[in-house]
């Protein structure tokens, strides 16, 4: 978590360990990880991967192309998987939505899973909401409320 001010809050949400990005590799090894930054993270991801570790690529916001040492991955006996909803057929998207309804929403309803909300805005203030979304330092969702 980039912002030290958010570490306690992230820990209270259930994180086993909270580290700064620059400490990520040294704080490993990790059994698994979700990758959503992309190319700049790859050298550290492989270095911090535990033996038999897994990486699931779900985003490439900072770039999709990288160089990867297959020998390093082989020595870790690691696994890389990748997925995106965008290119899936409508039926698969519907299945994913139904799985959320079955498995995740009951946890939200029971209070076992919470989603941090940074700020709420009425729909009429959508531009201000987008501006807040574009700012750094958030911990949580920016929510537009329809009246």
Question: Where are the regions a protein language model picked out?
Answer:
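Glycine-rich phosphate-binding loop and adjacent beta-alpha segment
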Residues: 10, 40-112, 145-147
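Generic structural signal for individual residues within well-ordered alpha-helical segments
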Residues: 8, 43, 127-130
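Short catalytic-loop micro-motif centered on adjacent basic/acidic residues
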Residues: 31-34, 54-57, 115-118
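Structural signal for short hydrophobic segments within the conserved structured cores
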Residues: 16-19, 115-121
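A short acidic, often aromatic-flanked loop/helix-cap motif at beta-alpha or helix-coil junctions
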Residues: 23-26, 88-90, 122-123
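C-terminal capping/lid region of NAD(P)-dependent oxidoreductase domains
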Residues: 105, 110-119, 127-147
